[in-house]
Amino acid sequence: MMKNVLVIGSTGQIGSELTMKIRREIPGSTVVAGYIPGAEPKGILLETRPAELADVRNAPQLAAIVEKYQIDTIYNLAALLSAVAEKKPLLAWDIQMNGLLNILEVAREKKCAVFTPSSIGSFGPETPHVGTPQDTIQRPRSMYGVTKVATELLSDYYFHKYGVDTRSVRFPGLISNVTLPGGGTTDYAVEVYYSAVKGEEFVCPIAPGTYMDMMYMPDALHAAVQLMEADPTRLVHRNSFNIASMSFEPEQLFAKIREYIPGLKVRYEVDPVRQAIANSWPDSMDDSCARAEWDWKPTYDLDSMTVDMIECLRKKLL
């Protein structure tokens, strides 16, 4: 059972919601919101404290936080997303690999569990695209994907070599009604809801017919907590589990939104960088191992997610 938790990247797309979820749902827990300069916590994230500067590239800083709060679990959410990582590959490597190594070393010394998410971006064009198996060829062609595969391998290494309790999932594209997109290939599936609710034309950077696995943020947060609370004796895999919820292409998403907002207008301006990344990713993943080993099961499908997204964004924007 998690008690003292450090969330690194607490103000990002996943971290901002995950930090508050753990604070609400695990009685007596201390959840430290780790952040970097320029991405300070605000609002309820700050009000519910504690918060600490936590740069993954600063190992002594991380060790001091773990010692100060007697951290038992680290959520490492520091990363550049796929499209941004292609523009800044060296920075992506520094944050995602050198940063991870710092975290794993601190975890080894201080006996912490570590969750570092992987992604559908860890797969490449040689991967079976439909029903992508848990264990299969990966070979990504983006810097983001390369770092994710290396993350999986390094995390497994620290488990087998040093006994560090490392666990992770391969997140699909994540759709949130709370945080804005941050430079990912699947961001279009968030942005279109904002355009629809505001009555604006949406310019889609991904070509019609491009299927990708997606997931509503509440399911992703549940997975991140559920896996870290799971019985370790059941875990055959650790880094990283396929988890799936829904798979769709742009026209299917737009048609679903038009069931509730008929006036949605869309035109395509395909971004070749994002499209190339999307083409190399799976259309759908087989998550049977997660279901068997820790009882993973999503709650939302495309329709229920769309209803909730529109309702929440109307309250937020109008």
Predicted regions and their residues:
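C-terminal substrate-binding subdomain of Rossmann-fold SDR/epimerase-dehydratase oxidoreductases
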Residues: 205-207, 213-318
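NAD(P)H-binding glycine-rich loop region in Rossmannoid oxidoreductase-like domains
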Residues: 56-95
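SDR active-site strand-loop-helix element
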Residues: 8, 34, 74-80, 114-120, ...
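Active-site helix of classical SDR
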Residues: 147
